[in-house]
From Swiss-Prot:
Function: Involved in peptide bond synthesis. Stimulates efficient translation and peptide-bond synthesis on native or reconstituted 70S ribosomes in vitro. Probably functions indirectly by altering the affinity of the ribosome for aminoacyl-tRNA, thus increasing their reactivity as acceptors for peptidyl transferase.
Pfam families in alphabetical order: EFP (PF01132), EFP_N (PF08207), Elong-fact-P_C (PF09285)
Residues spanning the membrane: none
GO cellular component: cytoplasm
Entry keyword set: Cytoplasm, Elongation factor, Protein biosynthesis
Family the entry assigns: Belongs to the elongation factor P family.
Gene Ontology biological process: peptide biosynthetic process
Protein name listed in UniProt: Elongation factor P
Classification via HAMAP family: EF_P
Gene that this polypeptide is encoded by: efp
Compartment(s): Cytoplasm
Pathway: Protein biosynthesis; polypeptide chain elongation
UniProt signal peptide: none
Length: 185
């Protein structure tokens, strides 16, 4: 059991036979009345998002989540295919289950798939990935010492902010949890 006061982004719990993932949370302590936790929850299986408030002392059933490292193979436009490295079984996933991770995944990269009662519901990219910059505007000469950022499109199609000195065709390391540039490789 976990306390509602301990809810954080990414926490999973079971309620009414469904598993929920906390998308947003806010601890509210009004001047008058009891404190409460306002949350935005995503149903891990259906993808439906709901807003719910909890008493911070309320107890929630922790969901048993299985994590499995799988290899991203390809997409056919609608489904994204991942392969289990032990059984070589392929599982297709809809875009709504991979939307956060797919921005940073290339074919043949490994990702962590989360399962609840045998059904995949979420994909996590590795914390750091190395990706090629497919397009960015050239930086102006003399602007390399400042902390100014510019948009860059990665080989996966994601757009992130990079420093001015980073050029098209270079490989960079990206933190997939925040979507931020880390360093040139």
């Amino acid at each position: 059991m976990i306390s509602a006061g301990d809810l954080r982004k990414g926490t999973t719990f079971e309620q009414d036979g469904q598993v929920y993932v906390v998308v947003e949370f806010l601890h509210v302590k009004p001047g008058k009345g009891a404190a409460f936790v306002r949350t935005k929850l995503k149903n891990a299986i259906t993808g439906a998002v709901t807003e719910t408030t909890f008493n911070p002392t309320a107890k929630l059933q922790e969901a048993v989540i299985e994590r499995k490292e799988m290899q991203y193979l390809y997409t056919d436009g609608e489904l994204y295919y991942f392969m289990d490295q032990e059984t070589f079984e392929q599982i297709p996933l809809n875009y709504d289950k991979v939307e956060e991770a797919i921005k940073f995944l290339k074919e043949n990269m490994f990702a962590t798939i989360k399962f609840f009662k045998g059904e995949a519901f979420s994909v996590e990219a590795p914390n750091f990935v190395e990706l090629l910059i497919s397009h960015t505007e050239p930086g102006a000469k003399g602007n390399t010492t400042s902390n100014v950022m510019k948009p860059a499109t990665l080989e996966t199609g994601a757009t992130i902010q990079v420093p001015l000195f980073v050029n098209e065709g270079e490989t960079i390391r990206v933190d997939t949890r925040t979507g931020e540039y880390m360093e040139r490789v």
